Amino acid sequence: MSVIGIVAEYNPFHSGHEFLMNQARLAAKNDPIIVVMSGNYVQRGQMAIMDKWQRAKAALASGADLVFELPFSFAVQPADIFANGSIKMLSDLGVSELFFGVEDANLNFSYLGQKINQIPKNRMDFRDYTQTYATQYNEMVAREVGHEVNQPNMMLAVAYAVASEQLKNPLHLHPITRVGSGHDDPLLQDKIVSSATAIRNYCLHHPNDLSELKKYLPKGELVSLESQKVYPNWNLLFSFLKYRIESASLEELQSIYQMSEGLEYKMKEEIHTAEDFTSFLRQIKSKRYTYARLRRLCLYTLLNVTENEIKDSYQDVSTLLLGYSSRGRNYLKKIRKDVQVPIISKVDKKNAASGTLGLQVKVDRLFEQIIGEDQNFGRKPIEVK
């Protein structure tokens, strides 16, 4: 049996994701497809536009057999930690094949992963404080392996390859060339596949009429988007962030995960004059940090996620089962006794008291307040026949 894995955010699920799923299904035939998906917060430091249950439902409708939540501790992180957490989780769940979308599928990603893992860890490549870590990393990779990886999906793909090659049994990698718009294209394009960024932007600017999105979404997804009472975004959250920064002491801010190099002082200083979240980011931006890094820091601050909480969560890693098909249920029965990561089907006070699930429940409290629906307690995995 070949078990196929996909790492995803599905923010939201669109035609490009459906294309990748179809390619995976052609390869899998009757074998299971497992998706590890970010929860209600995504890698670049934002709330997802739809909750994790609706996005899992879309994946199942498109052909996934099992959808698991990637814990917050891994999901809202730079590419290397995001990849390490998701790839190890897929491996622990028995996945042997990884499908992912990239701008250039002709590269030998396994080879790139091997080469990058051979680079000494004590190098001085990342000491230039006039450039972001991401820029320095990409320059180092290009210098060492001869390929630039500065496009979003390429960077993640290389991170997947590096993480895979660190496993005892590396995954077989299957890069699939992306179709349609670029990853970060902000506007809808006259193509069948538009970027998730463009779709989110359209939802925020035209919440009362989403009919234009129909051609970019799989069947049924437009109805799901239209049923949303609110589309979570940083504009909604900025007043909460402002209160949090203004009311917290410097000592409290210093305990926040990834708060470093005096950023707490800069945030305290600039929050008073910032008109909105975008202007606040510009005011605290420096050459040292990417906007994604600062958005993540703002999210950690808003949710009061501390350095110790992240460290403690890594001592007790589990994953929440969001949904399954009949094929997925049968596969779970076969592996459940031997699986390397605890699988949670029902959240209760005991399993939510600590670890990655405990932190997930904590951070989801705000998301619940925004959308008005419970996200953990009282929920059960979605079943599709």
UniProtKB/Swiss-Prot annotation:
What does the entry list as the binding residues for ATP?
Answer: 7-20, 101, 153, 178
List the keywords (alphabetical): ATP-binding, Cytoplasm, Ligase, Nucleotide-binding, RNA-binding, tRNA processing, tRNA-binding
What the entry lists under InterPro entries is as follows:
Rossmann-like_a/b/a_fold, tRNA(Met)_cyd_acetate_ligase
Q: What class of enzyme is it?
A: ligase
Q: Name one GO biological process term.
A: tRNA modification
**UniProt-annotated location(s):** Cytoplasm
List the GO terms this entry assigns under cellular component, sorted alphabetically: cytoplasm
HAMAP family for the chain: TmcAL (MF_01539)
Relate the protein's function as given in its record: Catalyzes the formation of N(4)-acetylcytidine (ac(4)C) at the wobble position of elongator tRNA(Met), using acetate and ATP as substrates. First activates an acetate ion to form acetyladenylate (Ac-AMP) and then transfers the acetyl group to tRNA to form ac(4)C34.
Name assigned to this protein: tRNA(Met) cytidine acetate ligase
